[in-house]
Amino acid sequence: MSFDLIIKNGTVILENEARVVDIAVKGGKIAAIGQDLGDAKEVMDASGLVVSPGMVDAHTHISEPGRSHWEGYETGTRAAAKGGITTMIEMPLNQLPATVDRASIELKFDAAKGKLTIDAAQLGGLVSYNIDRLHELDEVGVVGFKCFVATCGDRGIDNDFRDVNDWQFFKGAQKLGELGQPVLVHCENALICDELGEEAKREGRVTAHDYVASRPVFTEVEAIRRVLYLAKVAGCRLHVCHVSSPEGVEEVTRARQEGQDVTCESCPHYFVLDTDQFEEIGTLAKCSPPIRDLENQKGMWEKLFNGEIDCLVSDHSPCPPEMKAGNIMKAWGGIAGLQSCMDVMFDEAVQKRGMSLPMFGKLMATNAADIFGLQQKGRIAPGKDADFVFIQPNSSYVLTNDDLEYRHKVSPYVGRTIGARITKTILRGDVIYDIEQGFPVAPKGQFILKHQQ
């Protein structure tokens, strides 16, 4: 058989092993894995490189439509491709209107036409004002529903995202359980975090350490514990977003051991930045839950290596620079990290701490694809989409602002020496990013809908 593409001589991350093997691609799908596969129209030599499944980033904010001056599809998905991401799962907030019904998600689809460099799945929102319309988003094909039990949204904007109270969460989780949809939750105690934050502002405590102190670990743990129980009673599958503390992970592990259907994610910034670095970097490193101290970070690494965290995500949530101005307590909370997930975590987890390549592949791609039902994604296996990223190990570079593809070329990772590089990203058999050529093809990304899997 003649193939469209054969990738030769790379160390390929398979589901339970990594070995030097060739991959054949035909019609955008992985057709064969082995040696001496035959002829192809194109042959790529991946000698000395790690060939990973393209990253499935399960937590991305693209603020188009309505706030494309924060981040748009064109810039955001180019940054993703440059960072080795081939599929993103897009959050239902930051854009206006928030993605909370059929009309708003159709606006997303229209806004993205001709702009997607990578593939994208969508999450719907569970908010205080759409509980009777959740079925609309399920019918369109979202892969889950996101909600906040922490305070969120601009009360002065009618169609912005909104947090839910316990009653709204419970009723929404009941409906989502009936629909077979997971609920994803931002877990922080709203009232306590809000009051601690206001108290700090009144007293003039506005440093990074003060911000972290205003959102202590117990506020995350309490919220996780609460939504775990409510989701269990409601009969809904739960995914806990961006867990920032070992204690928070322990709550998920305990529930899982008791038989509850629950998963969790975390983000690179909780593993590679600490509060002292946050103080030095400033508002670019502000997020919620916040970046915590070094002891907390060490505990997170232990949980990651123990297999208690299901997937790693960017939580890419940028904004215009003026929203990061001023003191840390007032600045927008959100990190621009889409482009730096794979290389930073390959360096920190694999090269510096000895994580196995199969575990890396599961954390960056396979598990997220499984959690959200992306059946064609996340694995290098025959029949799956031919989505790959080439990683050059032990190849250090210093990230600069000019390297970034974001709408606003800022990130807390700028200035960091990263010990591995993404050299090529392939989506369904086509090179969408190359370290030498840039972006050689027009945007070919597609939306992935649940019912079309």
From Swiss-Prot:
Belongs to the metallo-dependent hydrolases superfamily. Allantoinase family. The modification N6-carboxylysine is found at residue 146. Binds 2 Zn(2+) ions per subunit. Can also use Ni(2+), Co(2+) or Mn(2+). Keywords: Hydrolase, Metal-binding, Purine metabolism, Zinc. Carboxylation allows a single lysine to coordinate two zinc ions. The gene is allB. GO terms for cellular component: cytoplasm. Severely inhibited by copper, and competitively inhibited by dithiothreitol (DTT). Zinc concentrations above 2.5 mM and cobalt or nickel concentrations above 1 mM are inhibitors. Zn(2+) 2 binds at residues 146, 186, 242. Its EC number is 3.5.2.5. The keyword GTP-binding does not apply. SUPFAM superfamilies: Composite domain of metallo-dependent hydrolases, Metallo-dependent hydrolases. The lineage of its organism: Bacteria, Pseudomonadati, Pseudomonadota, Gammaproteobacteria, Enterobacterales. Disulfide bonds: none annotated. Induction: By glyoxylate. Optimum pH is 7.5-8.0. The optimal activity is at pH 8.8 for zinc-containing form and pH 9.0 for cobalt-containing form. It comes from Escherichia coli (strain K12). This is Allantoinase.
